[in-house]
Design a protein with these regions (language model features):
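Positively charged n-region of N-terminal signal peptides that target proteins for export
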Residues: 1-5
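Short amphipathic alpha-helical "recognition" segments used for binding
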Residues: 6-8, 21, 385-386
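Bacterial N-terminal signal peptides
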Residues: 7-17
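An alpha-helical repeat/solenoid feature that recognizes helix-turn-helix modules
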Residues: 22-42, 53-84, 98-136, 141-333, ...
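Secreted/extracellular ectodomain signature
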Residues: 44, 89, 385-387
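Active-site-surrounding "flap" and adjacent substrate/cofactor-binding loops of secreted or lumenal enzymes
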Residues: 85-95
Length: 388
């Protein structure tokens, strides 16, 4: 592990200073906000000691990027000027390929998408070209007419892990999030945009429109997905005609991912596709486990849920039986009780790398930061939310 120097981050994490402001503009009560503050601080402390000598976490780009985003979103004074953050970005920069992708050995789309989010969170103009190149790479991965695939293909509009691997909703939702993170800056009507910026906006719009075609084929909603495999409960499956929950069953992680992706792709919240996804969520609301999947991918589920609910902009999920579930309160308390004494989180079920405490702790911190934030902050350039 790296020898640490006494920086602002060190002083913040190892002092009595609070991360969350005394009177936070938060959607949770002050008592819970203080518990979240302590939890985030403990998690960041633990991650502080896990950084490798090469600046990475676990020597892996996507995991490193998730950790960097967790730090950058926790406090506005955390910046790339901090040595540990700079070292992390130096590792990511070393993973940049000539075609704009950001990865080491495998899964170029997955890694590039998550690294792109971190580069945007850095809010550093020095990375503008890195961001543009990564966006161009992701848009180039989309399956469409340029790959001799027509709109009647089940895979049209999708994105997979990269290369020749077939598309799936999980990879597509990361790519959409990576594109959408700084949307508000891009769509500022008062800004005099260059032709390049205008063309980039047009390119993103086309990317979203094609992605929505693929999303429809992952949704169990027959009026938008008339394929024979489609059920009609409004939820989402992993890929057209196949679900990790068996058959073509809708399940929670992908339904939250689908909801989030539609909103990021600028589908109106009153659109039947969005409302049908929410109706599935309201009928299958769960916190302790992920519906139909148990503990498999549980922390992925938590961070996707927090992002989706923030994007959807509601404070309570109303179940068909009339029960109102304050999702921020429910999810925060669940995550708080799952934290270890050392400050990290880990899943006893190791599927999808969730026996890796660095990955799972990064997921959880991002979820807690969403919980503590404002719904409308979801696509802001640098989402420091309430931490001041």
């Amino acid at each position: 592990m790296k020898l640490k120097v006494y920086t602002w981050i060190f002083l913040l994490l190892f002092s009595c200073q609070s991360i969350i402001a005394q009177e936070p503009a938060t959607k949770v009560d002050l008592s819970l906000a203080k518990e979240i503050d302590h939890s985030i601080k403990s998690g960041l402390k633990w991650l502080y000691d896990q950084q490798e000598d090469d600046g990475s976490w676990n020597h892996y780009p996507a995991i490193t990027a998730l950790v960097l985003s967790a730090y950058l979103r926790a406090h506005p004074s955390v910046s790339e000027s901090e040595p540990m953050i700079a070292d992390g970005f130096a590792f990511l920069t070393a993973c940049i390929k000539p075609n704009g992708s950001i990865y080491s050995e495998d899964m170029p789309n997955y890694n590039t998408s998550i690294c792109l989010i971190a580069f945007k969170d850095a809010n550093n103009p020095a990375y503008d070209q890195v961001i543009k190149n990564a966006e161009d790479y992701l848009m180039g991965l989309q399956i469409d007419e340029s790959t001799d695939i027509t709109t009647d293909s089940l895979y049209y509009g999708g994105v997979g892990y990269g290369g020749d691997q077939r598309p799936d909703l999980s990879n597509l939702q990361w790519a959409i999030e990576a594109m959408a993170v700084d949307e508000r800056k891009a769509y500022d009507p008062e800004k005099n945009m260059s032709e390049d910026e205008k063309n980039r906006i047009i390119g993103k719009k086309l990317f979203y429109d094609k992605a929505l075609v693929f999303l429809a084929r992952c949704q169990n909603l027959q009026n938008v997905n008339p394929e024979s495999y489609s059920q009609n409960d409004g939820g989402f499956m992993y890929e057209p005609g196949s679900s990790k929950a068996g058959g073509t069953n809708s399940y929670a992680s992908m339904t939250y991912a689908g909801l989030k992706s539609m909103i990021y792709a600028r589908v109106d919240k009153d659109d039947p596709r969005v409302q049908s996804a929410y109706n599935w969520i309201s009928s299958n609301y769960a916190i302790e486990t992920t519906p139909l999947m148990g503990l498999q991918g549980l922390y992925y589920y938590y961070q996707t849920m927090a992002k989706a609910m923030n994007a959807f902009g509601i404070e309570s999920v109303d179940s068909p039986d009339g029960t109102s579930h304050p999702w921020r309160h429910d999810l925060a308390n669940q995550l708080l009780k799952m934290q270890t004494a050392e400050g990290f989180w880990v899943n006893e079920n190791g599927r999808w790398w969730e026996n890796n405490p660095v990955l799972v702790t990064a997921y959880t911190l991002l979820a807690l930061e969403e919980i503590a934030g404002l719904p409308e902050s979801t696509t802001v350039k640098k989402r420091n939310v309430i931490f001041k």
